[in-house]
């Protein structure tokens, strides 16, 4: 699916943007703090209904405005569709071809074909940072693979909050009543993540070998569930094992007022040659591993959807060494995908630019075309 046109109104620092992107590569140039990342976030928000960065929805609205809006025309096998989302302090409202979700349009229809993958400098810290970032990666990748994950995750968060509140203040029977919905929703997420990791692992291994060469150690990817829950079983058995872990930890959880087992406590393990990459990988190896993980995600979606996702790359080239940057740009040039890239330095992108690459300057929230 290709983005034909983009309209942004009062989103972050973008007052009014009308953009006709290239069907292949659109490059946004400008100094830091001018709005390049905000434009990528507008596209990401449109295609996922979630902010790219962890903020309150009110922070997406330009200062002084009551609401922000993003709309885009997407061309796919079924023709052209217009998707739009308005955001304000009170929430967001999405529409598909002018029909609001829930009253004429379904969430599944809205997300059909709207897969987008973002790659930012923060992702390069995925290996050495804490598990929160790796869980966010898993959740975003799972959402792209199965959009129903959005509703499943919301169900889990509701159940988790209810059980945590009961652990802190409620009688035993109240906690027990919230445990079953938590187990049901948690097992569904565990199985989704397990299946996703199984799909990504061989692609990660192949991409890392291609980036790093035949002498590099073998890359591995695994899912580690908290509380010793073994996820390599059918969903009903995973649910039973999660329930057992929660029962075994009940007294500890009561003391802390917090649920200590479940998807919100799990981790994604990345290893090189059988050793944890976080502790034993060099910075260069860690960055190559993250690059390989992103390529694995893209290729997995390409296989599942029959086409590559929309790509959003936020100043990644400036954070990679020349060899890895050449690999990334070469990969993008060969991939039949629509990509949006930001950079403060045109020279980092230009070697891979094709005749259909469109360059724009972003300055103080204003987006202007540049001569290619």
UniProtKB/Swiss-Prot annotation:
ATP binds at residues 30-37. InterPro entries: DNA-binding_RecF, DNA-binding_RecF_CS, P-loop_NTPase, RecF/RecN/SMC_N, RecF_2. GO terms for molecular function: ATP binding; single-stranded DNA binding. GO terms for cellular component: cytoplasm. Keywords: ATP-binding, Cytoplasm, DNA damage, DNA repair, DNA replication, DNA-binding, Nucleotide-binding, SOS response. PROSITE patterns: RECF_2. Its main location: cytoplasm. One of its GO terms (biological process) is SOS response. It is found in: Cytoplasm. The RecF protein is involved in DNA metabolism; it is required for DNA replication and normal SOS inducibility. RecF binds preferentially to single-stranded, linear DNA. It also seems to bind ATP. Belongs to the RecF family. HAMAP family: RecF (MF_00365). This is DNA replication and repair protein RecF. It comes from Anaeromyxobacter dehalogenans (strain 2CP-1 / ATCC BAA-258).
């Amino acid at each position: 699916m290709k983005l034909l046109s983009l309209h942004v109104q009062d989103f972050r620092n973008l007052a009014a943007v009308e953009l006709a992107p290239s069907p292949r590569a659109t490059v946004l140039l400008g100094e830091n703090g001018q709005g390049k990342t905000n434009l990528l976030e507008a596209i990401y928000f449109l295609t996922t209904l979630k902010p790219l960065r962890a903020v309150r929805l009110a922070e997406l609205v330009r200062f002084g405005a009551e609401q922000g809006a993003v709309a885009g025309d997407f061309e796919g096998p079924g023709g052209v569709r217009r998707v739009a989302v308005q955001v304000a302090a009170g929430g967001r409202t999405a529409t598909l071809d002018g029909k609001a979700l829930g009253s004429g349009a379904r969430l599944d229809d809205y997300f059909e074909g709207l897969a987008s993958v973002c790659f930012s400098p923060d992702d390069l810290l995925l290996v050495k940072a804490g598990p929160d970032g790796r869980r966010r990666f898993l959740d975003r990748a799972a959402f792209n693979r199965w959009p129903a994950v959005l509703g499943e995750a919301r169900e889990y968060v509701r159940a988790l909050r209810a059980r945590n509140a009961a652990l802190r203040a409620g009688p035993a029977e109240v906690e027990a009543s919230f445990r079953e919905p938590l187990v049901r929703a948690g097992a569904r997420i565990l199985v989704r993540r397990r299946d996703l990791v199984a799909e990504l692992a061989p692609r990660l291994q192949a991409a890392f070998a291609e980036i790093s060469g035949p002498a590099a150690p073998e890359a591995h990817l695994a899912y580690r569930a908290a509380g010793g829950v073994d996820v390599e079983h059918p969903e009903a058995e995973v649910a039973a094992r999660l329930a057992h872990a929660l029962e075994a930890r009940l007294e500890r959880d009561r003391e802390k007022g917090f649920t200590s087992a479940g998807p919100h406590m799990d981790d994604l393990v990345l290893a090189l040659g059988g050793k944890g990459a976080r502790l034993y990988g060099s910075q260069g190896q860690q960055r190559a591993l993250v690059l390989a993980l992103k390529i694995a995600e893209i290729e997995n979606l390409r296989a599942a959807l029959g086409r590559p996702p929309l790509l959003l790359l936020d100043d990644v080239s400036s954070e990679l060494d020349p060899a890895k940057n050449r690999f990334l740009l070469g990969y993008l040039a060969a991939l039949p995908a629509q990509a949006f890239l930001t950079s403060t330095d045109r020279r980092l992108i230009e070697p891979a630019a094709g005749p259909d690459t469109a360059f724009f300057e972003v300055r103080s929230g204003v987006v202007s075309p540049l001569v290619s």
